[in-house]
Structures are given as structure tokens and as C-alpha cells.
Amino acid sequence: MFYQNSQRRIYYDDQLQKHTQFNNEYIYAFTWEDPRVDHRLLKIREDDVVLCITSAGDNVLDYIYQASPRRVHAVDLNPNQNHLLELKTAALQSLPYAQVWKMFGEGRFPGFRDALISKLSPHLSSQACQYWMSHTSTFDSSHGLYETGGSR
């Protein structure tokens, strides 16, 4: 049984053409831009509210970790990018460091499906959970996460 223990994502209609145009695939598996430039220019503080493009979610997580703003709104026209960010936050909340490293450092995690069901699913929206249930091979394949997405 899957359940969501918190709401971090607003509802969207995943059947709209503006979302289906991505063919159920994210474009970016990792972020190319360096968030240090953003920090230097934006000077994000604890009382700030940040609006940013999700992309692969790496800069979003960096803003939270480095600056601890009051709130971060991550948006992306491609809902699959948000599924990836949800997966990263779920992993950081529920998995030991070694497993997080396997998933996002090495890009391969043979036990991904089991971890998704037993540890990650409570931290995912139902749409993100369904997405990753249908993409468990992302972390099992010989290529791994960093050979997936539309920008490979």
C-alpha cells in the first residue's frame, strides 16, 4: 500500500497536451548550471521566497541547503522534472547516505524498486510514485540515471 505523508506539490492535469508533449520523459537528469553564481548574485536569505525552474532539482536543493530560504517554489512545464526532484527529496528524507549516493552519485541502484515501495513512496505524490514505478529500470540499467533523459 502506498500513501503520501505530506503534500509538497499542487495538483496538475497530467493529460493536458502541454504536459504530455514530453512523452513521459524528463529532459535533464542533472543540472548543468552552477548555483554558486546564483548565490553570489541573488544573495538568498532565510526570509526570502524563491521561485525557480526545477530542471533536475539540483539547484533547488542547493538553494535550500545553502541559504535556507523561507520557501522555494520550483516549477517546470515538464512534470517529469518535478517527479525527479520529488524522488531526490524523498531519498534524502528516507534513505541512508550510501543508498542516496548509489542513486544520485553513481546513478545506479539495483534495489531501487524495493526502496521505492518500502521507503520512498510515503514521500512522493501519487503521480510521482506512479511515474517511478513505471521507470524502475532507470536505476537498474547498465547505463544508469545519467544516461537517461532527453539531454543525453
Describe the function of each predicted region.
Residues E25-V49, D58-D62:
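Conserved alpha-helix/loop element of class I SAM-dependent methyltransferases that forms part
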Residues L51, H73:
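Conserved beta-strand positions in the Rossmann-like core of class I SAM-dependent methyltransferases
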Residues N80-R152:
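Class I S-adenosyl-L-methionine-dependent methyltransferase module
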Residues Y65-R71, P79:
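Conserved S-adenosyl-L-methionine
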Residues V60-Q66, H83-K88:
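A short acidic (Asp/Glu
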Residues R8-R9, D34, A56, P96, ...:
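Alpha-helix initiation/capping motif
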